[in-house]
């Protein structure tokens, strides 16, 4: 077996050269980070779950006309994706106050926002991914006006779809992050959705209990990260022995069933 050439390694994934020109293999790791990688750890099986969830979400988004980099899942931890020129902007879509917006503006966590809010952050770990305005994006040429129109339009469409998808399994989509890239056809380019959509980059709360089913369990030392990620996958029908989405999730009881305190 020939050794694959590594293209890039991030906090949660590794990108390898793909089997055909214009493709990459995206490998999902179990590594977990928070606070711009100041906190590090491992969530066992996270890469496998995130691979499945992201495959499921990207496939469904493609069905409603959202262009993405996803081609197909290769195995438990890898998927084949289109190679894209990543736009250095992290797009955060917020429906309910939580995380940094609560700290910045003094809004109580859990308060529904008057309307969906889109924020932009410059992707630079050394700078701590600072929040930016559209004027910064235009000034420094990170994306054109037309690309930003496509990005904001797709972000709203993705949010509308995901809110409904998660509500159907008794989960509130509090906020989430998206990344976009360009693919080229000669002198012309178009914007596509890239990276992943999983509990790593979404805040997901059980509608009944308020339990956090995402990486906040790692950020806040709440424990039960593995069970929370698995619960999201189970409700989406991605795990065997699916008990259906109608059950109320009680993380304490779930851990006891697994022999944990």
UniProtKB/Swiss-Prot annotation:
Gene Ontology cellular component list: cytosol
EC number: 6.3.2.6
UniProt pathway: Purine metabolism; IMP biosynthesis via de novo pathway; 5-amino-1-(5-phospho-D-ribosyl)imidazole-4-carboxamide from 5-amino-1-(5-phospho-D-ribosyl)imidazole-4-carboxylate: step 1/2
Keywords: ATP-binding, Ligase, Nucleotide-binding, Purine biosynthesis
One GO MF term attached to the UniProt entry: phosphoribosylaminoimidazolesuccinocarboxamide synthase activity
Gene Ontology process terms (BP): 'de novo' IMP biosynthetic process; cobalamin biosynthetic process
Record SUPFAM superfamilies: SAICAR synthase-like (SSF56104)
InterPro entries: SAICAR_synt/ADE2_N, SAICAR_synt_PurC, SAICAR_synth, SAICAR_synthetase, SAICAR_synthetase_CS
Catalytic activity: 5-amino-1-(5-phospho-D-ribosyl)imidazole-4-carboxylate + L-aspartate + ATP = (2S)-2-[5-amino-1-(5-phospho-beta-D-ribosyl)imidazole-4-carboxamido]succinate + ADP + phosphate + 2 H(+)
PROSITE patterns the UniProt entry points to: SAICAR_SYNTHETASE_1, SAICAR_SYNTHETASE_2
NCBIfam families (alphabetical): purC
UniProt cross-references to HAMAP family, sorted A to Z: SAICAR_synth
Family designation: Belongs to the SAICAR synthetase family.
Protein's name in the database: Phosphoribosylaminoimidazole-succinocarboxamide synthase
Organism, as annotated: Novosphingobium aromaticivorans (strain ATCC 700278 / DSM 12444 / CCUG 56034 / CIP 105152 / NBRC 16084 / F199)
Gene: purC
